[in-house]
Amino acid sequence: AGNLNLQRLFVLTGSTTASASELIINSLRSYLDVRVIGKQTFGKTVGMRSTMNLKNRLDTSPVTFHIYNKDREADYEDGFHPDVAIDEFKSDLAEFGDLKDPLLGQAITR
């Protein structure tokens, strides 16, 4: 087990942010201050396991588990609402790592 040695984490999101990204937000918010910057996430609180039957050409992905954090919280079916709402596509895009990027700029200045 390790320690991130952080007090606060900023997560940059878009409307298609889901699944593993939301799992990270939900899991870490039990341990530190997690701030969401961007758009509301998708809201996927479950996981699936895909199986393929080649003989019948059938692929199924049933829901096999519900994701909770250590506090038994899984209350993001409607997604995580951003602490700072930004539509990154309403302004000019910048190079990766450039502080002119609206999401990164907000995270760095907080």
Task: Please tell me what each predicted stretch does.
Residues 1-110:
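C-terminal "post-core" interaction segments
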